[in-house]
Amino acid sequence: MKSNWKITAFLYMCSFLGSFISATYQQQSRLPVILGARQRTDLCPTIRIGEDDLPGFDLISQFQIEKAASQGIVQRVVGSTALQVAYKLGPNVDFRIPTSAIYSNGLPDEYSFLTTFRMTGATLQKYWTIWQIQDSSGKEQVGVNLNGPMKSVEFSYKGVDGSLQTASFLHLPFLFDSQWHKLMISVETTSVTLFIDCIKVETLNIKPKGKISVDGFSVLGRLKNNPQISVPFEVQWMPIHCDPLRPQREGCGELPARISQTVIERGLPGPPGPPGPPGPPGVPGIDGIDGERGPNGPPGPPGPDGDAGKAGSPGLPGEPGADGLTGPDGSPGATGPKGQKGEPGPPGARGLPGKGLLGPPGPAGAAGLPGEVGRAGPPGDPGKRGPPGPPGPPGPRGTIGLQDGDPLCPNACPPGRPGHAGLMGMKGQKGSKGESGELGKQGYKGEEGGQGPIGEVGAQGPLGIPGIRGITGITGPKGNKGARGLDGGPGPQGLPGAPGGQGQRGPVGEEGPKGERGPQGTRGINGLPGPKGESGLPGVDGREGIPGMPGAKGEPGKPGTPGDTGPPGLPGLPGSPGMKGIPGPKGNRGPPGVPGLMGNSGKPGEQGPEGEAGPTGPRGPPGSRGEPGPAGPPGLPGKWGPQGDIGLPGLPGPPGLPGGKGDRGSAGEPGPKGEQGAPGSEGDAGEKGDLGDMGLPGAKGSVGNPGDPGSRGPEGSRGLPGMEGPRGAPGPRGLQGEQGAPGLPGSQGPAGKEPTDQHIKQVCMRVMQEQLSQLAASLRRPEFGAPGLPGRPGPPGAPGPPGENGFPGQLGPRGLPGLKGPPGEIGRKGPKGEAGERGERGFPGRGVKGLPGPRGLPGEPGKPSYGREGRDGVRGPPGVAGQPGIPGPPGPPGPPGYCEPSSCRMQAGQRAAGKNMKGP
């Protein structure tokens, strides 16, 4: 049952790879069809800019490189990733085909050349052309050239006058580094643009291009000055696309991930500078990528102690050291004369914690100097196996074969197809230990690792040197009057503080309740010299009273108006240097330095076997300051340092915890009414707030090492969900948030625990030690006084000269429509306009009655209708005699006739004579 999930995962991966291979095959099989149709049409058919599935010329298919690889003429190699296939073109293969077979009608006026390739070995230093079109005499008409000695890329083209023109892209050393790169050139009518690894490098203007001749040949990988010699290189992808804007949409996801890079637009060449002096020693290299943790090795023998190094720069403040022993009480000094008006006294004992709203995060402190380089740690666990080395140089040329070969390999028979994979061999014996290899070159800076686990709490470290005083924070909002805190016990006498920076004027605070009179305190030492203040108003003469102890902390009043600064005090004694601090934590990343000149890439050496750890060498001189490295793993707890000497009294620290309640002192004499006290000290930090907003991106970094480009592979199907990655590094510090609204007054909390005398002594000693170096630093430079209070605003100055015209501002928002202006003057008659569009039908007009028109043509016959019967017409004239009609039918027999006797006989004789009688 345990292996069921493995079988399921295996079947899922097989189906994923099958669909990916099928999609890749279908995508590759489409291109020759497009190319075949492409050659039978015009240069580039009617296209829409922005489409990727447009006709083009696939040079790998046109030069039949895949066929040559199947015959063993060229070698198939792994491309920019494990899923990509590339071809290694050797120096003995002649890739030359007639131009008319690819570009039967020549090249279009606008197109783009794209290729993913890699140069290795001696090719990096050669001046060669990766693609070229020659005329019938072998002269170059169009080509893309790579100039190894000059570290530049050239685009050559035939001009209108027939001369060869060249556009050169200079200062590209990152292209010549034995890595996979994606080179794309966008050729337009009047300009040509170079892209390397999907980053725009430069756009150059070009002259009009002439029409090329298709009577010559197209070649790949030739020397520029001797086109008969082939140059070895590896190619993964090489099309010519009909869309000149294709490089702007191309991605570089198939290139291996490397250090992020930033390509800066090349500026105008500056004048040659004078030769500089020899530079200082180089900074230490960047740490390599951490290997995975291996098995724990046996403990090694302890190494000898190195020589003591020179004193390093002061480190950042370390963790608070162990509490020192309490010193003996000093003898009381003699009563001194009445001093002048001093600075406001230290704040009273800490009140009960309030529950205010979380304030905005304060600004980050300045980064301190790095500590001294520590001793070398024990040998680390062995890392992962390094990447495979670069391909070796080509072997010697083989002997001439005995048979005639293929036209593409005339002197050798192609090897047979690769056989099936053999069975897995037996496990070999453990080899003998190899010799120690040479030290490899400095590796690239590794990517920032994920957040490591929280280390165990280390032992108390020695006391570090106090850090630099932070910048003055912004004035907080005026808080509401809080509830009166419980009276704390009298705290220990604090030392006078150095003059603080001038704070912003706060609102006038409410008058706090008068504090109870405290017991008499001992006289403090003289403070540091303050800046000379303005003469104050004369105060009321009071009685000379005995200085009393600080009273219990009264209710905090609202900030009052800053008082005048007192006269300077006597300078203090110089303090002894404090103990050397441990190296501080990693500081914030500094601003990017000025980009240095790019050096020539060296030839990569073969990776040697991992050598044994050598003996510990003598300690070298301290190197120059290196770049901040990544945060290392938590170190082992250090040993306790020796007890340090008691330093001079330091500057006053933050208020201590409330002291234990002392015995009630005897009633003192009533003192004069005290002046308004200074604002109380800032309370302890509140609870950890929510995560702040993401900050703005940092300043633009310097030019990084270029990444390896590669061609864009086919889009794969969706992969299996990956494992959850390591937690990323914390983001950049966010901007300081807006000032929050004042919180409501908190309710009075429970009484805190009364601290012990030992705890109070520890706090005082810690504060004195933290402020010790700041006091010593101020005493070492007495010629610079503390900054004085800002003066009153001066009178307005005279108006300055008019400034230069600024850059045009951003387009403002659309303004409101203005008021209707007065009618303008009648303009001059303009030129006759163009005929307008046909207007809509107008309303019927009223015209003057016109003259009768000419008689119209007879109309068409009307539709039949029923009319009324008309009147009888007038008798007409007799008509024309008609034609004889058809004889009618025989009439009925007539009546019997009669005749007169005289006429009857004559008619009978006539009838008898007229008849043709036959017979009797």
UniProtKB/Swiss-Prot annotation:
Signal keyword on record: yes
Laminin G-like domain segment(s): 50-244
Comment text on domains: Each subunit is composed of three triple-helical domains interspersed with non-collagenous domains. The globular domain at the N-terminus of type IX collagen molecules represents the NC4 domain which may participate in electrostatic interactions with polyanionic glycosaminoglycans in cartilage.
Organism: Gallus gallus
Region listing for Nonhelical region (N-Terminal) (NC4), in residue ranges: 24-266
Function: Structural component of hyaline cartilage and vitreous of the eye.
Subunit architecture: Heterotrimer of an alpha 1(IX), an alpha 2(IX) and an alpha 3(IX) chain.
Gene Ontology molecular functions: extracellular matrix structural constituent conferring tensile strength
Biased composition (Basic and acidic residues): 432-448, 826-843
Gene coding for it: COL9A1
Alphabetical keyword list: Collagen, Disulfide bond, Extracellular matrix, Hydroxylation, Repeat, Secreted, Signal
Compositional bias ranges of the Low complexity kind: 364-378, 601-628, 637-649, 804-825, 851-864
Gene3D superfamilies in UniProt: 2.60.120.200
Protein name from the UniProt record: Collagen alpha-1(IX) chain
Extent of Pro residues compositional bias: 269-283, 379-396, 790-802, 886-898
